């Protein structure tokens, strides 16, 4: 049996808002370590990987490994019935047909009970290799979201160039060109505003802005975001949470770097 309680419905809502337009149906894999999800988007261009560790729940119980196949839009609709401050308890039997959600108000004067039908999803697990990335950029999540939105008004592709001068986001479109360059700096008054760049060699890659803009829907989950890049491998965009992470992997566009 699974029983896992979020202290606030807001976290689960934010997680679903970040991934539900990339992935329609997915397995939530529950085991001793916590609840994880790994799924590709329908175009097989982006991969989503999420983990909420068991210590992110209070209480957490999972007697055996369970895969909960869920339509994310259906789950999101049910979660709209919860107030952001509500406690949310997820429950499932060992061979479940439904995921039970119980919403409890802060004052414990309201309890709502919902069941979401589960699906049988045949999903292969992709081994994500551990890569020593050539460039790692950690920056304010809101800044990354702003850059992505701004450049998306001009083009559908962005070239990210990480070098010792800094990291440059540039694009070319029908109505003109645009670029933003960030340089490493430490903000002593607010560490969350610092920009950290770790580099072993320069990297230049081009990506779909539509997907990057989609990833930035995770901005409410974390104040910081980390971009990890190496030539010819997918970009890793990671949002770290208190008890886990949300990671997005995006394959680079081939043969477009020269056009930029």
UniProtKB/Swiss-Prot annotation:
Protein transport recorded as keyword: no
PTM comment: Monoubiquitinated on Lys-164 by the rhp6/rhp18 complex upon DNA damage, and then polyubiquitinated through 'Lys-63'-linkage by ubc13/mms2. Ubiquitination contributes to efficient DNA replication in the absence of DNA damage.
GO CC annotations, alphabetized: chromatin; cytosol; nuclear replication fork; nucleoplasm; nucleus; PCNA complex; site of double-strand break
Keyword Membrane: no
Outcome, altering residue 68 to S: Impairs homotrimerization. Reduces capacity in enhancing the processivity of DNA polymerase delta
PROSITE patterns per record: PCNA_1, PCNA_2
Keywords linked to the UniProt accession: DNA damage, DNA repair, DNA replication, DNA-binding, Isopeptide bond, Nucleus, Ubl conjugation
Superkingdom of source: Eukaryota
Covalent link Glycyl lysine isopeptide (Lys-Gly) (interchain with G-Cter in SUMO), residues: 164
Localization terms from the record: Nucleus
Crosslink position(s): Glycyl lysine isopeptide (Lys-Gly) (interchain with G-Cter in ubiquitin): 164
One annotated GO molecular function: DNA binding
DNA bind region: 61-80
GO biological process: DNA repair-dependent chromatin remodeling; DNA strand elongation involved in mitotic DNA replication; error-free translesion synthesis; error-prone translesion synthesis; leading strand elongation; mismatch repair; mitotic DNA replication lagging strand elongation; mitotic DNA replication leading strand elongation
Recorded family membership: Belongs to the PCNA family.
Subunit (UniProt): Homotrimer. Interacts with pcf1/CAF-1 subunit A (via PIP motif); the interaction is direct. Interacts with cdc24. Interacts with rfc1. Interacts with rtf2.
Task of the protein: This protein is an auxiliary protein of DNA polymerase delta and is involved in the control of eukaryotic DNA replication by increasing the polymerase's processibility during elongation of the leading strand. Involved in DNA repair.
Protein name: Proliferating cell nuclear antigen
The organism of origin for this protein: Schizosaccharomyces pombe (strain 972 / ATCC 24843) (Fission yeast)
Gene: pcn1
């Amino acid at each position: 049996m699974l029983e896992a309680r979020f202290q606030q419905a807001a976290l689960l809502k934010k997680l679903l808002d970040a991934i539900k337009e990339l992935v329609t149906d997915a397995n939530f894999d529950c085991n001793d370590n916590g609840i994880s999800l790994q799924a590709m988007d329908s175009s097989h261009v982006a991969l989503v990987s999420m983990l909420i560790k068991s210590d992110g729940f209070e209480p957490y119980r999972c007697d055996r490994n369970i895969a909960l196949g869920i339509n994310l839009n259906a789950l999101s609709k049910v979660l709209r019935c919860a107030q952001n401050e509500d406690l949310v308890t997820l429950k499932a039997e060992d061979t479940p047909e439904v995921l039970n959600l119980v919403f409890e108000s802060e004052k414990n004067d309201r309890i709502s009970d919902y069941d979401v039908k589960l699906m049988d999803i045949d999903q292969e697990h992709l081994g994500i290799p551990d890569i020593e990335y050539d460039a790692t950029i950690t920056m304010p999540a809101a800044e990354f979201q702003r850059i992505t939105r701004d450049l998306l008004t001009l083009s559908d592709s962005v070239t990210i160039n990480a070098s010792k001068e800094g990291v440059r986001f540039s694009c070319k479109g029908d109505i003109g060109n645009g670029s933003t360059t960030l340089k490493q700096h430490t903000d002593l008054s607010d560490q969350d505003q610092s920009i950290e760049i770790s580099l072993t060699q320069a990297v230049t890659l081009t990506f779909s802005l539509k997907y990057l803009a989609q990833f930035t829907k995770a901005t409410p989950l974390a104040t910081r975001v980390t971009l990890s890049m190496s030539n010819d491998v997918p970009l890793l965009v990671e949002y770290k949470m208190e008890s886990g992470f949300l990671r997005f992997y995006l394959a680079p566009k081939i043969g477009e770097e020269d056009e930029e």
